[in-house]
C-alpha cells in the first residue's frame, strides 16, 4: 500500500513537470510567431562539405619586378687557337745622280729614300720580290743638256721604255707599271744609251715600288 502511494505521488509530480514544459513551449512558439526575425538567427557551423570540381584557369597577372642578377657562372673552356698570317709589306724609293757608263746595265742608286724592309739592293740596283702579289713601280728622271733612255726590266724582260733628249735645256721622263710578281722575281731600271751619249750634261733619277696587295 505504501508503494502504491509513493508511485501515485511520483506520477503526479511528473505530470506537473510535463504540463509546465508544454506551457513553456507554447509561450516560446507564441513569441516566435510574433517576432519572425528570431527564426533567422544562424545556428552553429556544420561540418565541411565535399570538395567541388576545379574551376577554369584565370587570366595571367601583370609581370612582376625583375629579380636580382645571379651569381657569375664558372669560366668556359679555352677557345681554339688559330695562327693568323700577317699581311706582307714591301716598299722602297731610291735616288741616283748618274747613269751607268755602259748600256744594258742596271742603274746603280746611291741613296735610299725609303727601304725599311731592306728589299732593294743598292749595290746591284735590283729589287727582289719577298712577298708574292701585285706591285706598282715608277721612275722619274730629270735630264739637263743630255739624252736619256731607260727601260723597266723584270727578270731580264723589258716591261716599258722611255727616252728623251735635252740638247740645250731640261727634259723629264717618267713611267709607271703594275706588275704581278712571284717569290724571288727581280725588277730593276736599266740604261739603254752608250757611253758617248752619257758624257755630257747631268741627270737625276728616282725609282720606287711598293706592294699593292699580296696573293
UniProtKB/Swiss-Prot annotation:
InterPro entries: C1q_dom, Collagen, Collagen/C1q_domain, Tumour_necrosis_fac-like_dom. It comes from the Eukaryota. Residues 43-81 form the Collagen-like domain. GO terms for biological process: hibernation. The keyword Signal applies. Residues 1-30 form the signal peptide. Its main location: secreted. Pfam families: C1q, Collagen. PROSITE patterns: C1Q (PS50871). GO terms for cellular component: collagen trimer; extracellular region. Keywords: Collagen, Glycoprotein, Hibernation, Secreted, Signal. Residues 85-215 form the C1q domain. Glycans are attached at residue 155. Plasma proteins HP-20, HP-25, HP-27 and HP-55 form a 140 kDa complex via disulfide bonds in the plasma and are hibernation specific. This is Hibernation-associated plasma protein HP-27. It comes from Tamias sibiricus (Siberian chipmunk). The lineage of its organism: Eukaryota, Metazoa, Chordata, Craniata, Vertebrata.
